[in-house]
Amino acid sequence: QLQQDVQNDDRKQELLRLAGKYNVYIVEDDIAADFDTNSRNDPLFYYDSSDKVIYIKSFSKVLMPGLRVCALILPDLIKNTFLEYKEWTDTYTSILSQGSLAVYLGSGMFDKYQDSIRRLYMNRMGVLQETVRENPAPGLEWNIPDSGFFACVKLKKDTPFDKIQPMLFKNNIRLMDTSKFFLKEFRNNHYYRVSVSKANEDEIRAGIPKLIRILGRYN
């Protein structure tokens, strides 16, 4: 599964080459497209000339998780098989949700909302970048995008999540154990994901210095 906004063009081309070589499909879950500030950052599907990409565009992040509606582009070879399975596993797709979304998209309201939500998260990430610059810490390597929900901080030392979790909770900081994101044979404890989805700009300014100090103790 590939979140497209973390991949550069060369990486995309290499992934497509490997998909063709080994005759496998790539599922591209384009959940962050609505937050992307780079209009030239095309999805992997854009480069696919061999029908190896299954492209999914969800509205759960930009609108609401409970909407449960997405757009899907499938390679011709597996369309009929997919529709057959969908018929038996998803017999009650909400007509109301689909109709409401269609009206919302067609009216132009979504475009206005998309612009406002993109600015909101651009501002939050900008504050995060600024706060990190103002609180330098040796051994911490940050990857902060220009917009979106998530940033990443890497520690030099392998630091199990359960080791720092009590101190995080004590300071009202909630992080996810990102070791679960890795295949078992590649699992490590160097990376921590930071989300700004539920934190406003003031909370980011107050919380990030605390996080940096805590991580610094274990690094």
Language model regions located:
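PLP-dependent class I/II
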Residues: 1-219
